[in-house]
Amino acid sequence: EWLSLREPADRAARDATLLARAAQVAGPEPVVLDLGCGTGSTLRTLGGHLPDTARWHLVDNDPALLERAATEAPGRATVHALDLRDLDALPLEGVTLVTASALLDLMPTEWIAALAARLAGAGLPFYAALSYDGIMRWEPELPRDVDITSAFNDHQRGDKGLGPALGPDAATMAARIFRDAGFDVH
């Protein structure tokens, strides 16, 4: 199960300063909406920085992943099987922080702009982590590494169901989009 296999590397890759900032802006009684929650990696990672009373809204389109994620916060997690095409369906009432991990690089520019507008309109902070940036380092380096990276980046830019994804350009584009929507981007 690749989500479990990658979680230790994902956890190590998260910026500790941004995690602390996300926990702070979530407030003393946090209610976190996690988009594309998968098995609950963000809940497990960010949850360690939040009070035990933190409540979670876990959003994914895969009921099996939602069921697994909900076991991480028994009695404090509500699962929502939603299609992320419909951002108006997001349960934002009472939420103090919205999160997304390893998601923005799978989304098109228009979706990220719509998300930024929706969250700005609701006055909600956003913590995004683990967006692929197109850089790979190989050991040992081999002559075809550049070709493999290029092919992977092309695949990342493919349509994942909502239009052509930003892939390796997601972090830069999302930062610009959220800044333009009035967010402080760190």
Where in this protein do the model-derived segments appear?
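Short catalytic micro-motifs in class I SAM-dependent methyltransferases
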Residues: 102-103
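Short amphipathic alpha-helix with an adjacent loop that forms part of the alpha/beta core around
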Residues: 86-94
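Class I SAM-dependent methyltransferase Rossmann-like catalytic core
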Residues: 1-26
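Conserved catalytic/acceptor-binding region of the Class I
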Residues: 124-186
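A short, conserved alpha-helix within the catalytic core of class I
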Residues: 106-119
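A conserved beta-strand element that flanks and buttresses the S-adenosyl-L-methionine
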Residues: 99
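Conserved class I S-adenosyl-L-methionine
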Residues: 29-38
